[in-house]
């Protein structure tokens, strides 16, 4: 598909006349179907088999409740038709998106098509190709009955040939009985995603009959929920009526949906998984209250606080069961939008819930495709079987809670029973909790964890709850519950509290990190890392050492509390020879910007320094590319990138493009020989690349390459030694992308370079600019996580860098004013 056609495709962007006409057709046919089925059910002149009655009645949602939503506990209410299939997909199954008009299916389908590199199949397009008329035009010309016949045949025909390698949208909008049977069959082999959206955001001006629209919506939601096997809530992206669509308006939606898809089709480069959460010592699960997530005034940046996972308690009560279908998907969507770490859904059932309600609640949780599902180890055998079949790629944590404390006198025979239950459920970890009556109760938790390691390889989390149980949370090794900073109470502790407890009791050792290089007094890295450490409750510090000699770095290595270094210009390549071990990234790039210092015991008594080298520059560049590349410019096989420069950062930039999936890379450098050496090097490492040298600014862009949608400037913007900063602009003949692209500037001294001003003037053409501070922060986030082995509070780091840069600029202006 032409990339230009991707931008802005959704019902909500159609002109009002087309939108309302199309939606009215949908409403009329669905309500007519409802009316027909209702009359068939109530007509005394017709008799039906029990199967017929069940099939027809199951299509109509009961609207007797206050909001028209079904009850989880109603034993007569079969919410889900899709079977308890394994939901284990391996990457080539076609993706089917269903839902109410204007929920954003087409937009999400195009995003999925680009991300998964699959054919995009839209029902309306197929229908026009078959009949020469749009669905609305066909209905007006031939009637609904004729349309239904063509629709049934066309749908069956498409799915006979496209069950693999496609993304299909617009089908099953008002599914007939024949289509429902097909949909039920497809749910055993293919992921079917029910797209949800707040109805208030789908009502357009001119929708005068709100009650009728609401009824139509309820019917649609009921039917699609029944036959789908996943649910995704599409968060509304507000837009002013008088402003055109910006190229990044759908970027957040793209990020959230691709992350959701990664839970269905796991990717090799997924975020920190359960293995990391349970193998690392002292990890934390941030508890996100449902009421807080539902509050539109909440500061959702708190979700990015440095925890290893975010957890939601999913429980049903008479007050919330009516809207839990909608609310749970919406809450999970908020988590995907505002945090980077795995999502845990903690399923809470009670003895008062009937079996139907428990099955429905479990299915609702599984449909969110969370990273982890937490369930009680006392779950009924039938639910255990349901979960084992239907969990897909979600991991399971088994939980066991006892009334009273887990103390030193706790019967360890209970531990073996708990472990056996967890093994039967195929759990990846266990959480044991008790209720502390006094602080002394907490020592037993440490004992239980140690004993569990002797009995099983399953990681065990063990702590007491309540005010007196807080110290056990500090000492618990994995997935300790921590509360939001704004929700701190005597009943819980924040992440910063937990970390301070570890360091103050000497379970963790304070470290120092150093920025090493020339002219580093202006570096923003120390302030960035120090702010992050403070936010996480860690007493680590970061300073800088400015030196004209690399040899001085040895003194820094030898400092007693030195935990690592950030290496900057000009020592990134020279320090390579000092490393005992390097990451693959650093080896390929040939440069190290992050050093971790380990101390290994020796027979001589004094520990030996062991230096590990990493490179996070490429991560900073790649993240800036991926965050700012619009869905219209999603990377595909024809995508081209332009790299300006041929030094160390250019190596990192090329590597970043390669890791992002770009295979066509052009290099421009004022010294052609250096550019050619760089191209020759990567040509030997990656044989599937096409590397082209642009010899000078008059060189035309290669005619057989797409114009670049990624441009990375890797040249200094200030004088370096005796060399003046390069001064040129990108030629117009290289800027031919009709959908713009992303321009990434490495330099931030000054922040607004001439190239940045030049590219900012092309914003109306779709160009997005990421400046040097953006790159600094993104590589700094990765650097922080390597140095501290902790997730970074990225919003703190971003804010600190911008604030410190502004302070430095103001101080510089004041100094110049004083001198004048």
Curated annotation (Swiss-Prot):
Domain of life, source organism: Eukaryota
Feature: compositional bias, Low complexity: 59-71
GO molecular function, one term: 3-dehydroquinate dehydratase activity
Region (Disordered): 25-79
GO terms (BP aspect): chorismate biosynthetic process; quinate metabolic process; shikimate metabolic process
Organism: Talaromyces stipitatus (strain ATCC 10500 / CBS 375.48 / QM 6759 / NRRL 1006)
Protein task: Multi-domain repressor protein that negatively regulates transcription of the quinate utilization pathway genes. May mediate its repressor activity by binding directly to the qutA activator protein.
Similarity annotation: In the N-terminal section; belongs to the shikimate kinase family.
The protein's assembly and partners: Interacts with qutA; transcriptional activator of the quinate utilization pathway genes.
Keywords recorded for this protein, A-Z: Quinate metabolism, Repressor, Transcription, Transcription regulation
Domain note: Is homologous throughout its length with the C-terminal 3 domains of the pentafunctional AROM protein. The function of the 2 C-terminal domains may be to act as a molecular sensor that detects the presence of quinate pathway intermediates as a prerequisite for the presumed conformational changes necessary for the control of transcription regulation.
Membrane spanning stretches: none
Pfam families documented for this protein: DHquinase_I (PF01487), SDH_C (PF18317), Shikimate_DH (PF01488), Shikimate_dh_N (PF08501), SKI (PF01202)
This protein's name: Quinate repressor protein
Record keyword Electron transport present: no
InterPro entries hit by this protein: Aldolase_TIM, Aminoacid_DH-like_N_sf, DHquinase_I, NAD(P)-bd_dom_sf, P-loop_NTPase, SDH_C, Shikimate/glucono_kinase, Shikimate_DH-bd_N
């Amino acid at each position: 598909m032409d990339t230009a056609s991707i931008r802005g495709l959704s019902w909500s962007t159609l002109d009002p006349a087309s939108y309302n006409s199309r939606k009215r057709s949908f409403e009329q046919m669905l309500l007519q179907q409802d009316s027909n089925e209702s009359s068939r059910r109530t007509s005394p002149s017709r008799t039906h088999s029990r199967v017929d009655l069940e099939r027809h009645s199951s299509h109509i949602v009961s609207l007797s409740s206050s909001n028209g939503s079904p009850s989880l506990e109603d034993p007569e209410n079969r919410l889900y038709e899709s079977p308890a299939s394994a939901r284990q997909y391996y990457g080539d199954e076609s993706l089917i998106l269903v839902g109410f008009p204007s929920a954003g299916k087409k937009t999400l389908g195009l995003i999925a098509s680009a991300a998964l590199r699959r054919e995009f199949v839209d029902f309306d397009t197929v229908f026009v190709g078959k009949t020469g008329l749009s669905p609305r035009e066909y209905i007006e010309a031939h009637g609904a009955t004729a349309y239904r016949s063509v629709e049934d045949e066309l749908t069956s025909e498409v799915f006979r040939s496209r069950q693999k390698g496609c993304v299909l949208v617009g089908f099953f909008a008002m599914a007939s009985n024949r289509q429902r049977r097909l949909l039920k069959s497809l749910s055993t082999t293919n992921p079917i995603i029910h797209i949800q959206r707040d109805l208030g955001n789908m009502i357009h001006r001119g929708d005068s009959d709100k009650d009728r629209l609401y009824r139509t919506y309820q019917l649609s939601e009921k039917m699609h929920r029944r036959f789908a096997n996943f649910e995704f809530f599409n968060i509304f992206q507000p837009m002013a009526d008088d402003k055109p669509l910006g190229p990044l308006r759908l970027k957040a939606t793209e990020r959230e949906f691709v992350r959701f898809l990664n839970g269905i089709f796991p990717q090799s480069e997924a975020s920190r998984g359960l293995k990391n959460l349970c193998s690392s010592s002292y990890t934390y699960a941030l508890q996100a209250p449902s009421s807080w997530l539902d509050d539109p005034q909440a500061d959702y940046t708190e979700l990015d606080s440095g925890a290893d996972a975010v957890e939601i308690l999913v429980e049903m009560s008479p007050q919330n069961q009516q809207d839990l279908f909608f609310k749970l998907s919406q809450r999970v969507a908020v988590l995907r939008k505002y945090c980077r770490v795995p999502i845990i859904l903690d399923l809470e059932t009670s003895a008062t819930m009937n079996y139907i309600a428990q099955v429905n609640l479990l299915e609702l949780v599984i449909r969110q495709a969370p990273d982890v599902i937490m369930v009680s180890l006392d779950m009924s055998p039938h639910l255990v079987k349901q979960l084992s079949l239907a969990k897909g790629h979600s991991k399971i944590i088994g939980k066991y809670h006892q009334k009273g404390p887990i103390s030193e006198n706790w019967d360890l025979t209970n531990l073996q029973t708990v472990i056996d239950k967890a093994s039967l459920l195929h759990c990846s970890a266990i959480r044991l909790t008790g209720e502390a009556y006094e602080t002394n109760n907490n020592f037993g938790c440490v004992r239980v964890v140690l004993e569990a390691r002797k009995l099983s390889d399953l990681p065990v989390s063990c702590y007491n709850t309540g005010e007196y149980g807080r110290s056990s949370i500090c000492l618990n090794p994995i997935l300790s519950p921590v509360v939001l900073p704004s929700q701190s109470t005597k009943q819980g502790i924040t992440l910063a509290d937990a970390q301070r407890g570890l360091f103050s009791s000497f379970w963790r050792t304070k470290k120092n990190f150093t920025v090493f290089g020339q002219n580093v007094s202006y570096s923003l890295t120390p302030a960035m890392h120090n702010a992050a450490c403070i936010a996480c409750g860690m007493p680590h510090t970061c300073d800088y050492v400015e030196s004209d000699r690399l040899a001085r770095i040895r003194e820094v290595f030898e400092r007693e509390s030195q935990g690592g270094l950030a290496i900057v210009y000009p020592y990134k390549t020279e320090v390579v020879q000092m490393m005992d071990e390097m990451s693959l990234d650093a080896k390929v790039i040939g440069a190290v910007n992050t050093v971790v210092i380990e101390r290994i015991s020796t027979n001589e008594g004094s520990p030996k320094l062991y230096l590990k080298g990493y490179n996070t520059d490429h991560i900073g560049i790649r993240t800036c590319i991926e965050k700012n590349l619009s869905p219209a410019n999603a990377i595909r096989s024809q995508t081209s990138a332009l790299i300006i420069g041929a030094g160390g950062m250019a190596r990192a930039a090329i590597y970043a493009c390669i890791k992002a999936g770009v295979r066509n890379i052009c290099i421009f450098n004022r010294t052609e020989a250096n550019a050619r050496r760089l191209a020759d090097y990567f040509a030997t490492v990656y044989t599937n690349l096409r590397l082209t040298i642009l010899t000078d600014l008059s060189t035309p862009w290669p005619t057989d390459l797409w114009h670049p949608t990624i441009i990375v400037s890797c040249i200094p913007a200030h004088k370096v030694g005796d060399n003046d900063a390069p001064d040129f602009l990108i030629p117009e003949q290289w800027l031919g992308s009709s959908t713009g692209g992303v321009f990434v500037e490495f330099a931030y001294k000054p922040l607004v370079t001439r190239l940045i001003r030049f590219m900012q003037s092309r914003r109306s053409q779709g160009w997005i600019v990421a400046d040097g501070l953006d790159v600094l922060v993104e590589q700094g986030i990765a650097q922080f996580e390597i140095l501290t082995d902790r997730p970074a509070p990225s919003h703190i780091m971003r804010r600190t860098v911008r604030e410190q840069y502004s302070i430095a600029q103001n101080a510089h202006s004041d100094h110049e004013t004083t001198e004048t």
